């Protein structure tokens, strides 16, 4: 019964201790209580954790290295056994070959065993001390929580309004006991952790010095065995010197090793860094070619567009000759065929484009060509006005009524200048044709006729570019 009571009391005490520790940690995380900290110990604990991680990694790699040595030992032993099996007893060096194979096996056994003892076992002993230190650090953390809990409990009793001396005395006793345990453990760890952290250097030096010495001895002894094996093979070669070792079926030059020369680009293509200059020079004057009157424009020009005639770069193009009245009439008729009577024309000074199927030529959009066109049309209009003035002065008298009166004149008798530019009828009729003023604004449309007089053909400015605004086109 006494043992049962003592066991129950110990269990209750442990439960109470765990509960008080959990409560203290929660209060510390919430900021209700102050946690005791030791910066020197925290730095030593961090170094210990780093040292432990490095040691575990090195031990893992050393274990893999020793395992590879075991695999190499087994492979070397199998190769030696196979060589002894295929080596005929009649061949020279049969006895020496068996001795070399036995020495090779013993050398591998010694190297493997010493690596395990002087490197792997030493690293295991080095890591074994980490377990005890790790547990003591965890114990120190628990004692720190007990110390903080006892201190906070004592402060709460001392700051209470109604003080109980018995409880205060008991709390002071618990606080002193927790303080002694914590400070003693904390002092020991603060002394041992820096020493343990510095011992890693001596451990690394010892391990790798042992590995270097073992490898040096192993390679020296293995070099002697390799020399002996080479001499045995030399004796066998002299014994059977008539036998020649030839590898057949291997070409001297493989296609996979030949690098073909880079393919040069064809000469017909221009250089990718230079763009061809398709535009004519700015100084050359070009005159657009008008479509043939009375012929189908679609036969010569695809998609209803007339291309300008070819011109040599840099060669000036002559302007158009002075136009006669008959030529002006034929030109106006062809222009009426191109433009149409009821269609609105969108004439942009930057884009001289026509609608599909109109058959009007599309002129090059260059400043030099536009300037030449304006000068040419101005000269044509001036010569036409002079010709009409001379014809009016010499061909018709002011009082002659036979040629102008009576309303017998037909549409075909109207002169090109009068029909196109809205001049007054020669018979003094009150019917007048509303003329179209050619203004420098290219986008304006010509107004239709108001009375029964024949409608003058519309000027397609896309075929004939706008004239110079300085020209006056009033009829004489």
Curated annotation (Swiss-Prot):
PROSITE patterns: BAR. Pfam families: BAR. The keyword Cytoplasm applies. Residues 325-339 have a biased composition (Low complexity). Residues 26-242 form the BAR domain. Residues 340-353 have a biased composition (Basic and acidic residues). InterPro entries: AH/BAR_dom_sf, Amphiphysin, BAR_Bin2, BAR_dom. Residues 279-292, 461-476 have a biased composition (Polar residues). One of its GO terms (molecular function) is phospholipid binding. Its main location: cytoplasm. It comes from the Eukaryota. GO terms for cellular component: cytoplasm; plasma membrane; podosome. Gene3D superfamilies: Arfaptin homology (AH) domain/BAR domain. One of its GO terms (biological process) is plasma membrane tubulation. The keyword Signal does not apply. Residues 310-324 have a biased composition (Pro residues). Residues 269-369, 395-476 are annotated as: Disordered. Keywords: Coiled coil, Cytoplasm. It is found in: Cytoplasm. This is Bridging integrator 2.
């Amino acid at each position: 019964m006494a043992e049962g009571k003592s066991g129950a009391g110990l269990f209750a005490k442990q439960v109470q201790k765990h509960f008080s520790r959990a409560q203290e940690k929660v209060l510390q995380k919430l900021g209700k209580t102050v946690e005791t900290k030791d910066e020197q110990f925290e730095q030593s604990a961090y170094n210990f954790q780093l040292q432990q991680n490095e040691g575990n990694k090195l031990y893992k790699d050393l274990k893999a290295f020793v395992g590879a040595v075991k695999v190499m030992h087994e492979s070397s032993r199998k190769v030696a056994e196979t060589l002894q099996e295929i080596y005929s007893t009649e061949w020279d060096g049969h006895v020496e070959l068996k001795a070399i194979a036995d020495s090779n096996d013993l050398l591998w056994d010694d190297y493997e065993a010493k690596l395990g003892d002087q490197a792997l076992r030493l690293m295991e002993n080095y890591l074994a001390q980490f377990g005890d230190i790790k547990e003591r650090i965890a114990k120190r953390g628990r004692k720190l929580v007990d110390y903080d809990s006892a201190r906070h409990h004592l402060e709460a009793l001392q700051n209470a309004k109604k003080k109980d001396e018995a409880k205060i005395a008991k709390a002071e006793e618990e606080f002193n006991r927790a303080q002694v345990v914590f400070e003693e453990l904390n002092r020991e760890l603060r002394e041992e952790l820096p020493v343990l952290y510095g011992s890693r250097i001596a451990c690394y030096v010892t391990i790798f010095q042992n590995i270097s010495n073992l490898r040096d001895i192993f390679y020296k002894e293995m070099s002697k065995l390799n020399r002996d094996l080479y001499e045995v093979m030399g004796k066998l070669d002299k014994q059977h010197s008539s036998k020649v070792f030839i590898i057949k079926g291997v070409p001297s030059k493989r296609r996979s090793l030949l690098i073909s020369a880079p393919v040069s680009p064809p000469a017909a293509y221009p250089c990718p860094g230079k763009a061809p200059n398709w535009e004519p020079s700015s100084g050359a004057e070009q005159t657009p070619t008008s479509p043939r009157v009375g012929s189908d424009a679609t036969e010569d020009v695809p998609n209803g567009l007339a291309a300008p005639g070819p011109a040599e770069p840099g060669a000036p193009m002559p302007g158009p000759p002075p136009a006669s009245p008959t030529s002006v009439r034929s030109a106006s008729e062809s222009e009426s065929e191109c433009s149409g009577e009821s269609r609105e024309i969108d004439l942009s000074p930057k884009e001289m484009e026509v609608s599909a199927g109109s058959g009007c030529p599309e002129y090059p959009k260059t400043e030099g060509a536009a300037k030449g066109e304006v000068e040419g049309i101005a000269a044509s209009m001036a010569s036409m006005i002079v010709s009409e003035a001379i014809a009016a002065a010499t061909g018709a008298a002011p009082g002659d009524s036979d040629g102008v009166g009576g309303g017998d004149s037909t549409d075909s008798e109207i002169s090109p200048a009068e029909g196109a530019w809205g001049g007054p009828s020669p018979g003094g009729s009150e019917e007048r044709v509303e003329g179209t003023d050619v203004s420098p604004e290219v986008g304006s449309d010509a107004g239709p006729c108001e009375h029964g007089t024949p409608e003058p053909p519309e000027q397609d400015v896309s075929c004939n570019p706008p004239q110079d605004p300085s020209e006056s086109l009033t009829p004489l």
